[in-house]
Amino acid sequence: MASTPPHWVTTTNNHRPWLPQRPRPGRSVTSAPPSSSASVSSAHLSQTTPNFSPLQTPKSDFSGRQSTRFVSPATNNHRQTRQNPNYNHRPYGASSSPRGSAPPPSSVATVAPAQLSQPPNFSPLQTPKSDLSSDFSGRRSTRFVSKMHFGRQKTTMATRHSSAAEDALQNAIDFSGDDEMFHSLMLSFESKLCGSDDCTYIIRELGNRNECDKAVGFYEFAVKRERRKNEQGKLASAMISTLGRYGKVTIAKRIFETAFAGGYGNTVYAFSALISAYGRSGLHEEAISVFNSMKEYGLRPNLVTYNAVIDACGKGGMEFKQVAKFFDEMQRNGVQPDRITFNSLLAVCSRGGLWEAARNLFDEMTNRRIEQDVFSYNTLLDAICKGGQMDLAFEILAQMPVKRIMPNVVSYSTVIDGFAKAGRFDEALNLFGEMRYLGIALDRVSYNTLLSIYTKVGRSEEALDILREMASVGIKKDVVTYNALLGGYGKQGKYDEVKKVFTEMKREHVLPNLLTYSTLIDGYSKGGLYKEAMEIFREFKSAGLRADVVLYSALIDALCKNGLVGSAVSLIDEMTKEGISPNVVTYNSIIDAFGRSATMDRSADYSNGGSLPFSSSALSALTETEGNRVIQLFGQLTTESNNRTTKDCEEGMQELSCILEVFRKMHQLEIKPNVVTFSAILNACSRCNSFEDASMLLEELRLFDNKVYGVVHGLLMGQRENVWLQAQSLFDKVNEMDGSTASAFYNALTDMLWHFGQKRGAELVALEGRSRQVWENVWSDSCLDLHLMSSGAARAMVHAWLLNIRSIVYEGHELPKVLSILTGWGKHSKVVGDGALRRAVEVLLRGMDAPFHLSKCNMGRFTSSGSVVATWLRESATLKLLILHDHITTATATTTTMKSTDQQQRKQTSFALQPLLL
C-alpha cells in the first residue's frame, strides 16, 4: 500500500505523521520560531542583536555536555558542498568568493605607489609544509568551516569571457609539459584573449579544477603582459582568492606582496582577498593584521572586506562578542550588512551553541528584509541544536517548507544529530524515515549518524543493515564509521564487538585517529577493563599521537570512579605540564568523586609523595615520562579496582578542603561550570556530615551562579514559597538538557534535600521532575519504576505514588491485581551498582509496615496484591506515615548558616579563598 505523504509536503500543515505532536509534555518550547513579521528598525539593532559587543548571549552554564567527542563521533566533516554541485565549476562572472572577487575596472581604489615604499609587514605564518602539495583538495576541514561559504547570492551577469578563453583553458588543462612549454602554449593564445576578463576566467577555472600550479603560471604570464594597473589588480585579486580557496596561503601572501610592491596590489579587493585566504586557513590573527594594515594605508574597508574579516574571525574560533565588534564598526562606517555578513555571524553562534543570539540575528535579517536561504536556516538549526533546544529546532525545520525553502540533507542531519545527542533516538529515527520518504538521499555523514544511533540503542541488526546499505551505494566505511561503531558498542558494554570492529578497522587499513583511541580508552575504562585500556594507550603512544583534554578527562574520570582521586588530581598537573588545559568535564569528575562514597585512600598517600602499587614489577621500572605516567595509573587502576575500601568519616574535612581547592582552580582558569558541575556539588552536599559543611559548599556555588544558589539555598532553608517561581525558571533551563543530565540534577537536588530533612521539599522536586518527564514512564496505577532515580528521589517518589494509589482507593476504584515497585537491581536492570537503591527502598517500606515484599524471581522488584495494599491504605495510621514533613525550620537553618559563615571566615586562610571574593 502506498504511503501517505506528509501533510506539509503539499499543504502548510507543519506536522509530520511519523512524529509525536510538538511540543512534548514537559519539554515545552521556550520561545516561538523566528517570525517573519517581526519589525525592528535598524536603529534598534543593538536591542535585537544588541550592540553586539555587550550582547546578552545565553550562558554556557547549562550546556551539560560532558564531552562532545564521545557523544556523537558521526558529525565530523559535514560539508554543505554536497548540496551545491556547481561549486567547483562556475562560469566567469559568478564569483567563487565575493570576498576575493575582482572589482569592476571603474571602481578600483588605489594609492599612489610613491606612498607605498614598503609592503605591510605581516607576522610569520603557520602554513602547510608544501606550498603546492596534493593535500589541498579544496575540501573544507570541518563542517563549520564549509557551512558559511554558500550563503552568497550568485552573480547573474552575462558571461564576459570569449570562446578563445575556453579554448585556452582546455589546452591548459590538457597540458603536461614543463614551465617553458606552458609559457609557449599561452603565447599562442595571447593575441586571441580579450583582456583581463578572459585571463581572470582562466585563473579561476584552473583553480576550480585544483590546477593551482597552472593557475599561478598563467597568472604570472598574464600580469607581465598587462600594462594597466587596475587590470593587474583584478588579476592579483582573482589569483589570491583562488589560492585562498585551496589553503595555499603562503603563495597567496607572496602574490599579494609582489603585487603590492608593483603598485597594483594596493586595492581594497586585493586586501580583502588576502583576508579571506587567511580566514579559510583559520589564521584569524593574520587576517586582522591585514585588515588593520589596509586602513593604515588609507584604504576604506567595504562590504566584501568586512564580510571577509568577520568570516575569518569566526573560523579562527574568536568569541562572538569580539567578532561582533567588526559588525558594529561596519555600521558606524556606513557599510550595511548583507546575507553573507549575517550568515557568518550565525556561524559564530553555531559554533558556540549561542542559540538565542542566533535567533536574534535571524530575526534581524527579517527586519532588514534580507532574504534567508537554506544555509541561513541550516546554521540557525545547528546553533539551536547545540544549545539543546530540540523542540524549537524541530519547529523551525517544519517551518522551512512554508517559507519556500526546502530542507536538504544537511538540514535533516543537523536536527537528527541534535536529537541523538539529547538521547531522543526515536525522534531521530523518525526523521530518517521522513528523509527516505521525501527522497532525500543519505550521504556518508547521515549514514554514520544513523549507524551511531542504532549501535547506541543496541539495535545491532539495523546497524548491520545500514552497513550493508552503505556498501551497496558505494560508500566505504571510514574512520568516522568505525568510531561510531566503537562508541556505540562501548556504551552497550559489548566489548567483544569493540575488539572485532577495531581489528577490522586495522585490517581494512583505516588509520585510527585521536577520537578512535579516546573512544576505546573511555569505553574500556568505564567498563573496568583497565588492562585493555592500557594496551590501547600503548598503541596510541606508538602511533605518535599526542593526548588531548578528552583522553586525559576519560582517564581522570576512571580514576575518580575507582576512588583514586589523589592520582586524578596529580594527573591534572601532568596534563597542565604538557600544555593541555583541563576543562569543566575534567573538574566535574573530581568534584563528583569527592561527593561520592569513593575514597582517596592510597591515592592520597601517593599525592603526598608515596609510591604506587603496580600490577607487575615491569611497571615499577618505568620512567616518569608522560606516557609511562599514564600507564602507571592504569596499572594502579587494575590493582585498586578489586581493592576498594569504604570511606572513613575522618576524611570528610580533608575532602571538603579538596573540593574548595578545585573550585579555586576553576575560578583561576575562568572555567564556567555547567549543570553537571552543579549536580556534582549537590551530590557532595548530600554526603556532608554536617549542615555547616554543606553550607560552605553552597557558598562556593554562589560564586559560580547566584541564581542556582538562590534556588538551592531557598529550598534547603524551607523557603519554597519565596523561591518556587525562580525554581521553575531553573527547571526550565535544566529541562533543555539531555535526559540523563536533567535526571542527574533532579536526583542530586532531591538527595540533598532528603539528606538534610527537607523531605516535603524533596517530594515536590521529584514530582516536578515527573511532570516534566525527566524520568519517563516512572509510574502507573500498577507500577512504580525507580531504576533511574537516586535514593532520595526514589524514597520521595514512593510516598507520592502511594498517596496517589490511596486516592484511587478512596474514590472507590479497584486497584490492579498486582502492584510493583522496581528498583533496577533485577535480572534486566539498567543500573550497575551495589543495590543501595533497593536497600533504601526496602528500609523505607519496612518502616511504614507496607505490605510489599521482594519478588523471588527478581531481586530488584517489590510486589504486593492490590487488595492487600488497599486494606493497608485504609488504615487510619497509614496516612500519617505517607505524608512527608520538613524537619529543618527556617530559624534553625538560619542559625546554622550564620555559624557556617563564621566557620568559613576562620578557615579562609587555609583554603586561600580570600582573593576570589575581592
UniProtKB/Swiss-Prot annotation:
Compartment(s) of residence: Plastid, Chloroplast
Region (Disordered): 1-138
Segment annotated as transit peptide: 1-41
Keywords noted in UniProt: Chloroplast, Plastid, Repeat, Transit peptide
GO CC, alphabetical: chloroplast
GO biological process, one term: mitochondria-nucleus signaling pathway
Compositional bias segments (type: Low complexity): 28-43, 90-100
Phenotypic effect of disruption: Defective in retrograde plastid-to-nucleus signaling.
Coiled coil: none
Highest taxon in the source lineage: Eukaryota
Domain Smr: 781-873
MF-aspect GO terms: DNA binding
Main localization of the protein described in the UniProt heading: plastid
InterPro entries in UniProt: Pentatricopeptide_rpt (IPR002885), Smr_dom (IPR002625), Smr_dom_sf (IPR036063), TPR-like_helical_dom_sf (IPR011990)
UniProt repeat feature PPR, residue ranges: 232-266, 267-301, 302-337, 338-372, 373-407, 408-442, 443-477, 478-512, 513-547, 548-582, 583-619
NCBIfam families: PPR (TIGR00756)
Annotated function: Involved in nuclear gene expression via the retrograde plastid-to-nucleus signaling. Plastid signals that depend on GUN1 can affect photomorphogenesis developments, such as cotyledon opening and expansion, anthocyanin biosynthesis, and hypocotyl elongation.
Family the entry assigns: Belongs to the PPR family. P subfamily.
The protein's name in its UniProt record: Pentatricopeptide repeat-containing protein GUN1, chloroplastic
Originating organism: Arabidopsis thaliana
Highest classification ranks of the organism: Eukaryota, Viridiplantae, Streptophyta, Embryophyta, Tracheophyta
Gene designation per UniProt: GUN1
